[in-house]
Amino acid sequence: MRTSQYLLSTLKETPADAEVISHQLMLRAGMIRKLASGLYTWLPTGVRVLKKVENIVREEMNNAGAIEVSMPVVQPADLWQESGRWEQYGPELLRFVDRGERPFVLGPTHEEVITDLIRNELSSYKQLPLNFYQIQTKFRDEVRPRFGVMRSREFLMKDAYSFHTSQESLQETYDAMYAAYSKIFSRMGLDFRAVQADTGSIGGSASHEFQVLAQSGEDDVVFSDTSDYAANIELAEAIAPKEPRAAATQEMTLVDTPNAKTIAELVEQFNLPIEKTVKTLLVKAVEGSSFPLVALLVRGDHELNEVKAEKLPQVASPLTFATEEEIRAVVKAGPGSLGPVNMPIPVVIDRTVAAMSDFAAGANIDGKHYFGINWDRDVATPEIADIRNVVAGDPSPDGQGTLLIKRGIEVGHIFQLGTKYSEALKASVQGEDGRNQILTMGCYGIGVTRVVAAAIEQNYDERGIVWPDAIAPFQVAILPMNMHKSFRVQELAEKLYSELRAQGIEVLLDDRKERPGVMFADMELIGIPHTIVLGDRNLDNDDIEYKYRRNGEKQLIKTGDIVDYLVKQIKG
């Protein structure tokens, strides 16, 4: 490709509304342009990267035995009503009617469509297992699209769905997809972790996320410092303290705390160790309960894990925190004065709280706290559960080492769905015994556009993007200095351009009438891994300057050796 025949829309300045580095660099490198909130046009450089990602995904999915299909973006509402997700999905599901007043949705995912297809196409267990995938546009009406293509409303996704007659068969395909995803992200040169995860609104049982480690990530990824254990923070188990509860050394006393509405204020005003405080959060109880609310207690320096809390049998789903009005109607005190003593509703305490002694908590009286509370002496020990987020330094749940926490960008997610959708849509085949058998399903997603942004978040410097070779828009940049004035430079540039292309190497020849500084800056911004610079001074010695983008190292290579050198660098 020649720059004179290419749209090289680079920007010198960083757009003001671009928050994260990938968004900034994708705009500056001329990869994307914003059309509307959460909607982006992909320019030629961006499309080249996108296609590289797609091709790797497609190759590994095919190698794993998956079959490619293509399903409509627009889906009839009746399928979503049949599955029960019409009500469950909420405002992220864009709903509309056609001219015949028939309701439709723009697909955020395709479980319903593929299940409908399979229930009409398959009839016998002999046709299974099968795994179908597509690389298709999705739309989710995000309340606040941000970070460029990292959290956009329209995006490209690889979604796959497998169908089985047994859990064992599903497990085989699930393991194959796990391995395929590991190959995909390894081939792309990404530093990632596969972590245990919650199934969320998709549903099902087992689930793993593939997280690219990056400071800008929205997820907390938890992993052991000595073993292979890794999990999303939502799912990571907080192990109960090994040390037995210390004996009481204080009497419980009622203390006036009129200006301490938060744990931070209580700690500061009364010089308490935060580890000796407990915070009490009230949430709505499950429908049909004899109590409207449930009290959840965690240590003052810990955070409630809402995913774990929502799974408690007495807690309503989705998890809903009580309003101050609802709290006062039940407890007769405000949110800043709540605690376990004389709490008139069911209480669930975290494992760490169960191990505490001589602690401080609200007295369920406005402006008052109890200090020196001890379980079983001052209040009976309530139900104990793991309801907090783990913190760095906690013991690993597998018993090996301690936990580290890093930020991650979710680029892939695999689920064992079980029979959630096949039961709802009555997708079955004739089993080996001649009876109808509901299908068991798995689903497997990769955010193709998000992968591009995640790769940049891991691979950049002060000059621009530093692409991993496998997904770079071009492999080699040829920068001829003053080629429009030097016939020798121009002739060699054209010769090398042809020879490299003949070797199957993707080349960008910068044949613009631009200053060398502009040419260098653009190529480094775009992030092309290998650059060769042709100039009369070096050519006097039959030399060409080669520069590797990742480490910035330069070297002189003889003109006759440069093609072989580049082929070896790129193809090994």
From Swiss-Prot:
Keyword Zinc (UniProt): no
Catalytic activity line of the entry: tRNA(Pro) + L-proline + ATP = L-prolyl-tRNA(Pro) + AMP + diphosphate
Catalytic activity, EC: 6.1.1.15
Superkingdom of origin organism: Bacteria
Localization in the cell: Cytoplasm
A GO molecular function held by the record: ATP binding
Keyword Protein biosynthesis: yes
Record key words, sorted: Aminoacyl-tRNA synthetase, ATP-binding, Cytoplasm, Ligase, Nucleotide-binding, Protein biosynthesis
InterPro entries, per database record: aa-tRNA-synt_IIb, aa-tRNA-synth_II, aa-tRNA-synth_II/BPL/LPL, Anticodon-bd, Anticodon-bd_dom_sf, Pro-tRNA-ligase_IIa, Pro-tRNA-synth_IIa_bac-type, Pro-tRNA-Synthase_IIa_type1
Pfam family, one: HGTP_anticodon
One GO process term, biological-process aspect: prolyl-tRNA aminoacylation
CC terms in the record's Gene Ontology section: cytosol
Comment text on domains: Consists of three domains: the N-terminal catalytic domain, the editing domain and the C-terminal anticodon-binding domain.
Subunit record text: Homodimer.
Protein's job: Catalyzes the attachment of proline to tRNA(Pro) in a two-step reaction: proline is first activated by ATP to form Pro-AMP and then transferred to the acceptor end of tRNA(Pro). As ProRS can inadvertently accommodate and process non-cognate amino acids such as alanine and cysteine, to avoid such errors it has two additional distinct editing activities against alanine. One activity is designated as 'pretransfer' editing and involves the tRNA(Pro)-independent hydrolysis of activated Ala-AMP.
Stated family: Belongs to the class-II aminoacyl-tRNA synthetase family. ProS type 1 subfamily.
Database matches in NCBIfam families: PRK09194.1, proS_fam_II
Protein name: Proline--tRNA ligase
Taxonomic classification: Bacteria, Pseudomonadati, Pseudomonadota, Gammaproteobacteria, Enterobacterales
Gene field: proS
